[in-house]
From Swiss-Prot:
Record gene name: dcd
Protein name: dCTP deaminase
Catalytic residues, chain numbering: E138
NCBIfam families linked: dCTP_deam
Native source organism of the sequence: Mannheimia succiniciproducens (strain KCTC 0769BP / MBEL55E)
Protein family membership: Belongs to the dCTP deaminase family.
Function: Catalyzes the deamination of dCTP to dUTP.
Length: 194
């Protein structure tokens, strides 16, 4: 069952779901709560490797990722981040989210931004039960023009679903969870896959 606006507000008030800083109640819609863009970004360095062998030996994959990903880019609140057509970038939400082990979250981009070509989450829009941290966004500009994105702008909407039971393996208790408590635009850790 997906939570409605009054349940989202109640779950926030009771601390069942935590979002920090907490968005005002005006950011809670019928079945979602708006999240804003943070100021942490990462991009791919152009032509720094001919390819990434995602199924290769861990050490080689790790070295390739180090070569192709930029260091963290922090921008000021009044500074735009330009996402050019055909470019993938990582960013974070401003808010940090904590979910209990019986609730799953779903992050969707805004229709108004999608109509300009912005994909907010290329594939991974599921926020696992037991998640805690900022949500990393996988931005892609499929439009024809560069997009100027600024910290604090509304970037997506988070909805919540109650699971049939408490998860036996919530994200915060998994040993193989690669992105626990992330607070910045963490690059891919595919090299840590089992």
């Amino acid at each position: 069952m997906r939570l409605c606006d009054t349940d989202i507000e109640r779950y926030l008030d009771e601390g069942i779901i935590e979002i920090t800083p907490r968005p005002g109640n005006e950011k809670i819609n019928g079945a979602t709560i708006d999240l804003r863009l943070g100021n942490s970004f990462r991009v791919f360095r152009d032509y720094s490797a001919p390819y990434i062998d995602v199924s290769g030996p861990r050490e080689e994959v790790s070295a390739q990722l180090d070569r192709v990903m930029s260091d963290e880019i922090i921008i000021r609140d009044d500074e735009p981040f330009f996402l050019h057509p055909g470019v993938l970038a990582l960013a974070t939400t401003l808010e940090s989210v904590r979910l209990p082990d019986n609730i799953i979250g779903w992050l969707d981009g805004r229709s108004s931004l999608a109509r300009l070509g912005l994909m907010v989450h290329v594939t991974a829009h599921r926020i696992d039960p037991g998640w805690e941290g900022r949500i990393v966004l996988e931005f892609y500009n499929s439009g024809k023009l560069p997009l100027a994105l600024r910290p604090n702008m509304i970037i997506g909407a988070l909805s919540f679903e109650i699971l049939s039971n408490h998860a036996a393996r919530p994200y915060n208790r998994r040993r193989d969870a690669k992105y626990k408590n992330q607070q910045s635009a963490v690059a891919s850790r595919i090299n840590q896959d089992e």
